[in-house]
């Protein structure tokens, strides 16, 4: 089983500085210079990959198939550092579930649950 080394409670954390490329202004549209919700989701997905993919058998990766309960709770300005933590909550065959939180300092700025499936790198 390609997920044999994974278990509930396994986790990863990433820290990322918010840049213009991650902001609501990334496409030249006027608005606040803050982390966009699509970028927050991207960081959450990257963190879940860090919690999983390095521990899979060779030839396997994960792909996302669901995001539930995504809430962007507070704005985060360009230059601020966001810390994202993904914790595996369930491993069911090739399906993996995560609880994810994002923080700026001590303030929670986002939460979600995420689900990924393990597939072979050739797509099977």
Model regions and ranges:
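Catalytic strand-loop segment that frames the active site of acyl-thioester-processing enzymes
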Residues: 2-37
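HotDog/MaoC-like acyl-thioester-processing domains
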Residues: 8, 78, 87-124
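Generic structural detector for well-ordered beta-strands
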Residues: 15-19, 71, 115-117
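Hydrophobic beta-strand-centered segment that forms part of the acyl-chain substrate-binding groove
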Residues: 49-83
């Amino acid at each position: 089983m390609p997920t044999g080394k994974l278990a509930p409670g396994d986790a990863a954390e990433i820290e990322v500085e918010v840049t213009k490329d991650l902001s609501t202004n990334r496409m030249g549209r006027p608005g606040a210079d803050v982390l966009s919700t699509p970028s927050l989701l991207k960081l959450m997905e990257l963190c879940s990959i860090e919690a999983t993919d390095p521990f899979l058998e060779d030839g396997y990766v994960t792909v996302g198939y669901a995001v539930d309960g995504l809430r962007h709770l507070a704005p985060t300005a360009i230059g601020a550092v966001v810390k994202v933590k993904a914790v595996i909550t369930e491993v069911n065959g090739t399906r993996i579930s995560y609880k994810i939180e994002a923080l700026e300092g001590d303030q929670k700025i986002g939460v979600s649950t995420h689900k990924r499936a393990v597939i072979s790198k050739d797509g099977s």
